[in-house]
């Protein structure tokens, strides 16, 4: 089992933290937001107050490692299709979104399964502010 640590990038620290917290403020159906570094570290994690995680830390870590591999695969198609904006998987209990922030960072967001598409639009708006 790999050790899960949290680090902070000094120049982006408050910006990334604010991004996660602002995503949780979008709607009560947003359960979780995290920024995960491609080298394997959780930089920030925010979970809605009163909720318990559905995955333990190791399962969450492995899930994001797999997401990084999938984003690498998507980049191979970028020339033909253009850059991917996000990826989404709908499970019985939640929807899980991943967003490519830059070459080093992935944003993960989990919502309740009945969350509507307006939440996604608002997340994309918040990301566009971060990536400017």
What positions do the PLM features span?
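Non-catalytic interaction/Regulatory regions outside core domains
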Residues: 1-132
């Amino acid at each position: 089992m790999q050790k899960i640590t949290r680090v902070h990038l000094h120049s982006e620290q408050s910006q990334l933290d604010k991004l996660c917290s602002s995503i949780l403020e979008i709607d009560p159906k947003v359960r979780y937001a995290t920024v995960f570094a491609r080298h394997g570290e959780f930089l920030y994690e925010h979970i809605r107050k009163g909720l318990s995680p559905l995955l333990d830390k190791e399962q969450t870590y492995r899930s994001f490692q797999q997401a990084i591999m999938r984003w690498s695969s998507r980049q191979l198609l970028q020339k033909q299709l253009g850059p991917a904006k996000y990826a989404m998987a709908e499970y019985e209990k939640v929807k899980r979104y991943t967003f490519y922030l830059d070459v080093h960072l992935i944003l993960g967001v989990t919502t309740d399964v009945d969350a509507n598409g307006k939440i996604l639009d608002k997340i994309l708006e918040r990301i566009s502010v971060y990536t400017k």
